[in-house]
Swiss-Prot record:
Reported function: Fluoride-specific ion channel. Important for reducing fluoride concentration in the cell, thus reducing its toxicity.
Name of the gene this protein is made from: fluC1
Superkingdom in the source lineage: Bacteria
Taxonomic lineage from the root: Bacteria, Bacillati, Bacillota, Bacilli, Lactobacillales
Coiled coil: none
Documented activity regulation: Na(+) is not transported, but it plays an essential structural role and its presence is essential for fluoride channel function.
Record carries keyword Transport: yes
GO molecular function terms attached to this record: fluoride channel activity; metal ion binding
Residue ranges of the TM segments: 1-21, 29-49, 55-75, 87-107
Gene Ontology biological-process annotations: cellular detoxification of fluoride
Species of origin: Streptococcus pneumoniae serotype 4 (strain ATCC BAA-334 / TIGR4)
Name of the protein in its database record: Fluoride-specific ion channel FluC 1
DNA-binding keyword on record: no
Amino acid sequence: MVIVYLAIACGLGALVRYFFSRYNQASKLPLGTLIANLLGCFLIGVFYNHVESKEVYAILATGFCGGLTTFSTLNDELQRLLSDKKVFYSYLTLTYIGGLVAIFLGILL
């Protein structure tokens, strides 16, 4: 039954990411993907520190946050931003450093 809940949670996370993706058209920086990835990292930190059940953690962190965050879209967007080095490096730094900070902030809560 955990697999079913995990799949549902993944779909819900992907749906949330889809709504954030609307912000990608309004900015040079893909803000929707950045927000989705940082939120997913933060939530993984929160779940890591506050969810005791391994099954519930798997559903929330692997399922929901796995569907919410996106490594492939991030790298596709980075490839598209290569022509503007300043935006490229800003996005790369914000995503990876911001992701680590977000996880630690989630753990600290």
